[in-house]
A protein has these predicted regions:
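Extracytoplasmic cell-surface/polysaccharide-interacting catalytic and binding patches
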Residues: 2-217
Length: 217
């Protein structure tokens, strides 16, 4: 039975590959991410890696998670506004070190290997969901994974509130469902990136992801 399930998983992944649903990304990088448009608009993705000399000053939140100190005022303001609407949220993930990012990617790869995929295929499949070290916004400290507190607010309620309101505080959903072919990351309703209020408003109004917005500047 276990072997049968593994075969089904491998077959399912192959069918998704053939249908174009899975987008494989490479571990190799092309350029260092640029700050030409400001620190808040640094584009980090599979072709723009974080420069080796990039420094971030972190602030620890009440729950122990860390973020870039510059986003704390707007992040706090957003959470206060949510509470006024009876939406109680928390930052589930903030800043990550390169080591932590590598560990998460390795764990995801090992999971797919345990399901019967060869190492190379498992890694490439994992990269659809986990960024390689140096290409994760979590290493900038500008990205936060936000969830409901599980006491008064469900994750879905938090996601709905963020979808409607996050841009007012300078945050945007970084990996929208309809932008996967551009971001090369599957939809993540919990992952929000600070870009500043001006950019967030324009991205919200024009339905742009960060790649599209930076290209338009």
């Amino acid at each position: 039975m276990r072997l049968f399930k593994k075969c089904l998983l491998v077959l399912g992944i192959l069918l998704l590959i053939l249908s174009g649903y899975i987008i494989f990304r490479s571990d190799t990088f092309i350029d260092d991410a640029s700050t030409n448009h400001g620190w808040n608009l640094m584009l980090v993705n599979h072709t723009n890696r974080i420069p080796d000399n990039y420094k971030v000053i972190l602030t620890k939140l009440d729950n122990g998670k860390e973020v870039d100190s510059r986003i704390v005022p707007e992040l706090s303001q957003m959470f206060r506004a949510a509470r006024k609407d009876d939406i109680y949220m928390q930052v589930n993930e903030g800043y990550r070190s390169s080591y932590s990012q590598q560990k998460i990617l390795d764990n995801r790869t090992d999971y797919y290997k345990s399901k019967g995929l060869f190492t190379l295929l498992a890694r490439r499949y994992a990269l659809n969901y986990v960024s390689a070290p140096g290409t994760s916004e979590h290493q900038l400290g500008l990205a936060v994974d936000i969830v409901g507190d599980n006491r008064y607010t469900t994750n879905q309620s938090a996601y709905r509130w963020l979808e409607k309101n996050a841009y007012k505080y300078g945050f945007v959903k970084r990996y929208p469902k309809n932008k996967t072919s551009i971001t090369h990351i599957k939809h993540e309703p919990w992952h929000y990136r600070y870009v500043g209020k001006k950019a967030a408003l324009k991205m919200h109004q024009k339905n742009l992801c960060l790649e599209e917005y930076v290209e338009s500047l």
